């Protein structure tokens, strides 16, 4: 939905030059549970996930730059898992692209409590983790934060 713009010392990016912003949040019901979908830069906008309502897992495929990824990637993903009390699955491109752009990588899976269940720091590979809907229910029962929200 959101288009990335970054001006660093040695690099700058403006996705609006080549991409079009999305229209709205996306979630779908599956046999696993309710899944929310977003892309990369969207992870910086918590109001997007509030607009989606309650979901069991969030998928955030990304291509974070090295400077923004090193500083913010894991923190943002763990925060989204904790505040939504849902799994976060974040496949991430990493390495040097033909254009010279370098992306951060660090694909990971995080549980609803914010614990990192699996991570692939760099290079090609697969991240696997057990994801259990009972864990989502357990976390929400132990800390019913969404029931205590006063702003909607």
Go through the PLM ranges and name each one:
Residues 8, 47-48, 117, 138-139, ...:
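Short acidic, gly/pro-rich beta-turn/loop elements at beta-sheet edges
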């Amino acid at each position: 939905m959101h288009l990335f713009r970054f001006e660093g010392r040695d690099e700058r990016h403006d996705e609006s030059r080549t991409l079009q912003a999305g229209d709205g949040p996306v979630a779908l019901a599956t046999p696993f549970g309710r899944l929310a979908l977003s892309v990369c830069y969207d992870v910086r906008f918590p109001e997007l996930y509030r607009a989606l309502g309650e979901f069991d897992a969030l998928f955030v495929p990304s291509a974070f730059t090295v400077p923004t990824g090193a500083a913010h990637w894991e923190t943002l993903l763990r925060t989204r898992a904790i505040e939504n009390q849902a799994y976060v699955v974040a496949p991430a491109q990493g390495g040097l692209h033909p254009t010279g752009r370098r992306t951060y990588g660090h694909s990971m899976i995080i549980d609803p409590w914010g614990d990192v269940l699996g991570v692939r720091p760099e290079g090609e590979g697969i991240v696997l983790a057990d994801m259990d809907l009972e864990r989502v229910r357990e976390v929400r029962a132990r800390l019913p934060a969404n029931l205590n929200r006063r702003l909607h």
